[in-house]
Amino acid sequence: MNLEEENTIFKPLYSLKHSPINAYFSKNSDDFVVRERPLYEFSGKGEHLILHINKKDLTTNEALKILSETSGVKIRDFGYAGFKDKQGSTFQYLSMPKKFESFLSNFSHPKLKILETFIHENKLRIGHLKGNTFFIRLKKVLPSDALKLEQALMNLDKQGFTNYFGYQRFGKFGDNYKEGLEILRGKKMKNVKMKEFLISAFQSELFNRYLSKRVELSHFANDFSEKELIQIYKISKEEAKELKKQEQFFKLLKGEVLGHYPFGKCFLCEDLSAELGRFKARDISAMGLLIGAKAYETGEGLALNLENEIFKDTLEFKAKMQGSRRFMWGYLEELKWRYDEEKAHFCIEFFLQKGSYATVVLEEILHKNLFE
């Protein structure tokens, strides 16, 4: 697999099989709203001021710059649980040293509001959130397409979704991973944060490709016979039987890495029949590789063979990255929707665990790329 020579953007496979659904989506502050959910309650004591902000059409970094210029706090002294996109309306939490609180007493900005403040003992760090609630409004939705949207949402709510990295990771032209590969091969870059981001894009690209291969396997296991699976994947009859008897869409593999969902530790799938029950109960999920020296290793069998198909040509760079694991299969929570036939608006709300992308879910529902 020569990533550098590819001229087209890789398109991961969908898990659902319906045809594309017609709807208009614009990622603006009225039609795309994100609300961050903290990982813990704020204590009410300590040296850090927690700001609950609402930003519109600003990146998190742009919001920090505005607050820095007003308060005098250096950008590096702010804390945040995650970066949020520029487009849309975002409610998120930031932290700053409490001693600068008075400088924000008369703060006013057309695109940035401080809604409330809290006191806490520590600075917010990346990952200090449970997840995000999303509101999405689709427009120009005909009644026939509204029915298709409802069915797609019910299917995703029942089976779960592919936890791909979203387009935000890969840049305007979808090729940030190529720059990450160049850096791993020795290209110099002074901007450390950009360097880390591009290498992360490389890891994310490989993750998406492996997950797409697992989605393909799951479709094949549903659609093909044991004999055909044996021929395609060069597996034993017993392995083919194990795939065929799994009723859920996303098939687990013996020897792959699993994790306690949504925050738990990694472990190997040794007893497939036992783990299937926990997977169906949403207590565990399969974890894909973010390549690196410290990532939990896959066992053996088909799981390792499929992983090697994607990662074998990049193992020489393994030592240059820390690595980790990411859930490949996630679940919608608190799902709601409503259709206004008169306005032709279809509104969707749901909660996702941290690290999951609402745009990935929306692309799965609509079966088309959002911003082409």
Curated annotation (Swiss-Prot):
Its EC number is 5.4.99.27. GO terms for cellular component: cytosol. It is an enzyme of class 5 (isomerase). The keyword Transport does not apply. Gene3D superfamilies: TruD, catalytic domain (3.30.2350.20). One of its GO terms (molecular function) is tRNA pseudouridine(13) synthase activity. InterPro entries: PsdUridine_synth_cat_dom_sf (IPR020103), PsdUridine_synth_TruD (IPR001656), PsdUridine_synth_TruD_CS (IPR020119), PsdUridine_synth_TruD_insert (IPR011760), TruD_catalytic (IPR042214), TruD_pseudoU_synthase (IPR050170). PROSITE patterns: TRUD, UPF0024. It comes from the Bacteria. The active site is at D85 (nucleophile). Residues 160-330 form the TRUD domain. GO terms for biological process: tRNA pseudouridine synthesis. Keywords: Isomerase, tRNA processing. It holds the Pfam family TruD. It catalyses: uridine(13) in tRNA = pseudouridine(13) in tRNA. HAMAP family: TruD. Belongs to the pseudouridine synthase TruD family. Responsible for synthesis of pseudouridine from uracil-13 in transfer RNAs. This is tRNA pseudouridine synthase D. It comes from Campylobacter jejuni (strain RM1221).
